[in-house]
Amino acid sequence: MERLEDYIAFDLEFNQHEGQTHLIQVSAVRFRDGQEIDAYDSYVHTNVPLKSFINGLTGITAETLKDAPPVEEVIKEFQDFVGALPMVGYNAAKSDLPILAEHGLDYSQQYKVDLYDEAFERRS
């Protein structure tokens, strides 16, 4: 596994409705030399109903999202936060990266470590 000195760990929460994926939260933490140095976290406004499963899994409610910024604003802020830094995530290659790509952000070259894959390989 590549050793990263300065990187972004990120996670997305999303809701599926009528075949479309809707972001509901974008979170990221910047680490340098193993220390958290900055963080970004935003809910995302949506008018689509939240599935009860998503509410139970995340604790996010429609009330939480009603005054949140629009997805375009959140995506821009996230892009500014990440910059060109390497990224790590948990199973993000299968879910989070494709969702970001739907919003015009291609982080496939910056995505360096998938912690799900690392954990699976170490158990084998």
Go through each PLM region and give its residues.
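Short alpha-helix plus adjacent loop in nuclease-associated cores
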Residues: 112-124
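Conserved non-catalytic scaffold segment of RNase H-like nuclease domains
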Residues: 2-105, 109
